[in-house]
Amino acid sequence: MNIVITVTNKEVPVALSLRTCVRTAAATAAAAMLALTTACSAGLGGPASSRTAQDGVIRFTFAPDPIWDYMHDTGIVDQWQRDTGYSIETSATWDEFGLFAGGHADIISTASFEVPGLEEQTQRETVIIGRYNAERSRIMVRADDTAQSLADLRGRRLGVFTTVSGTLVWSALVAQMHDMKVLDGDFDIVVADIQNLSNLLARGEIDACICYPDLSARELRDGSVRPLYDGKSSADLFAELNAPGHDGPMGNVFVARKDWVDGHPGEVSAFLDLWDRGLAEWQEHRDEMIERYPQHFAVATPEDIAFMKAYVAEHDWVTDEVRFDEQWAEDESSIFDLMRTTGVISDDITDPQFLPTEGVQP
């Protein structure tokens, strides 16, 4: 496998988008241990918490997120605290794993397929309590490229922002669909800044990329790049091939310490209620959120904001409900079956634990 790391000095005038930042070195170390750790999460304001757990208080660590910002700025969070009697303490950090490991967070958000890496790094037993958004990366090529799938790109330059994260999911899918290995010789892997991948593609410095659409708005809008597989994300293809009707694998789920969950069922239920409200607000005020918080979608110009509104309306990766049932958990776990079967992860990597609460009251 040839891996090239590209460093660019090109300025990008917008912040990282909704849940697509690259994790810090701590998370990268966990990924190296398990070949399973990913990109990022979403979050909030406030200083990093050093407080200990206490009843009635939910310590939630997240990275910047438009739905949370909207709920905070419109008073929904304050009203929820008054109505429930619970309080939520938030910590703004890209090192969710670090706070979690130190015992300073009860709930964080990460990809479902990151959870084994989280447990390995933090040495804490966890449980997935809610779902948030699907893994949304796409395979993109230049608009004038004749390739119809990655099978047509053997030996060419594939840009990725990490060799873990969504690359793991695509590695399993490509092995299943084309009997090819993404990270073992079938492509020249170019590791580059996540925000510059689609620009590198448009300029001809790479031949394809595993890209996020919300970080590719300008190139998608001007028609210089196009997605393969009919524009389907990794989650779309996974569901189509392995779990019909499923909405994952998840780019972000809500993960909590199992000992905390076992002792705080009321807090867990109230937290999920708050996020169900957030998901409902997203469905009703999606365009407004994109306008109010364009930095979370990596857009800045009116043209790119308008494009992102239209794109998300057609390809919304946010789930309709935060709670899930046993069948959903089983379908979500099947990504690990596929990864093990295709040799992307080792056979000793265990599935994460899930807490199905759809229709269940505390």
Where does each model-flagged region fall?
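Secondary-structure end/capping motifs
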Residues: 261-342
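Conserved C-terminal helix/tail region of periplasmic/extracytoplasmic solute-binding proteins
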Residues: 329-362
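Bacterial signal peptide processing site
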Residues: 41-44
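Bacterial N-terminal signal peptides that target proteins for export
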Residues: 9-29
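Pocket-lining segment of extracytoplasmic ligand-binding domains
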Residues: 113-114, 196, 203-294
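C-terminal motif of bacterial Sec signal peptides marking the signal peptidase cleavage site
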Residues: 36-39
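Short, glycine-/small- and polar/acidic-enriched structural segments
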Residues: 46-191, 207, 224
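Short, solvent-exposed loop/beta-turn-alpha elements that line the ligand-binding surface or hinge
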Residues: 78-85, 233-247, 315-327
